[in-house]
Curated annotation (Swiss-Prot):
It comes from Escherichia coli (strain K12). Transmembrane segments: none annotated. This is Ferredoxin-like protein YdiT. Keywords: Electron transport, Iron, Iron-sulfur, Metal-binding, Transport. The lineage of its organism: Bacteria, Pseudomonadati, Pseudomonadota, Gammaproteobacteria, Enterobacterales. Could be a 3Fe-4S cluster-containing protein. Probably participates in a redox process with YdiQ, YdiR and YdiS. The keyword Electron transport applies. The keyword Translocase does not apply.
Amino acid sequence: MSQNATVNVDIKLGVNKFHVDEGHPHIILAENPDINEFHKLMKACPAGLYKQDDAGNIHFDSAGCLECGTCRVLCGNTILEQWQYPAGTFGIDFRYG
């Protein structure tokens, strides 16, 4: 494999099925999260759910969460107001075998 090969997360995650509980997100960010802590999550989240646009605004959407707990381990005591597994029948359904 070439050292310059990239992996498109969206394609890899596209085979999974997500059952989103729109009214009850399982991850809630603090009101004004520390930007340095947020940058940790931008780099570490395997689903790429933590993003910053060109204007510097930060964005997060728990709908594509893999429930791996990386954000909880890295920033659970700093910028996450809540992290819990989704209620029964909600969350990710891994379909890649």
